[in-house]
């Protein structure tokens, strides 16, 4: 069975790209701003999928980013997500965006291989 991992970079107070992550972030997936550092503590957000029985090639999955504790966790403004095979840096699969007001796809190594925020508005999920 092929193991897949979703990788996300959430940054709280970093000056970044208000219209989504740049394609220069496709490999490293880390903020490149001199105005802030990556978060060093556990993320207050979680990534969930509907892949309860593991990865099956060709199947469509829903990926959701949400707050772990919605009462004490601030909304987020930026995200960048890819699906990768464990140990590799090349994204696999494609994304379809459910809400075009919040997110957009990015073409990293192939069409729609990543998804990122669309604007600087806050996002609750």
Please identify what each model-predicted range represents.
Residues 2-125:
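Structured recognition/catalytic domains enriched at protein termini
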């Amino acid at each position: 069975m092929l193991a897949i991992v979703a990788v996300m970079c959430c940054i709280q107070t970093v000056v970044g790209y208000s219209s989504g992550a740049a394609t220069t972030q496709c490999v490293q997936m880390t903020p490149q701003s001199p105005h802030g550092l990556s978060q060093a503590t556990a993320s207050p957000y979680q990534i969930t999928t509907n892949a309860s029985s593991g990865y099956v090639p060709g199947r469509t999955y829903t990926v959701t980013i949400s707050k772990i504790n919605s009462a004490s966790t601030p909304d987020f403004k930026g995200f960048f997500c890819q699906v990768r095979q464990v140990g590799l840096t090349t994204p696999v699969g494609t994304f379809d965006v459910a809400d075009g007001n919040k997110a957009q796809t990015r073409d990293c190594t192939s069409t729609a291989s990543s998804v990122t925020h669309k604007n600087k508005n806050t996002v609750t999920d």
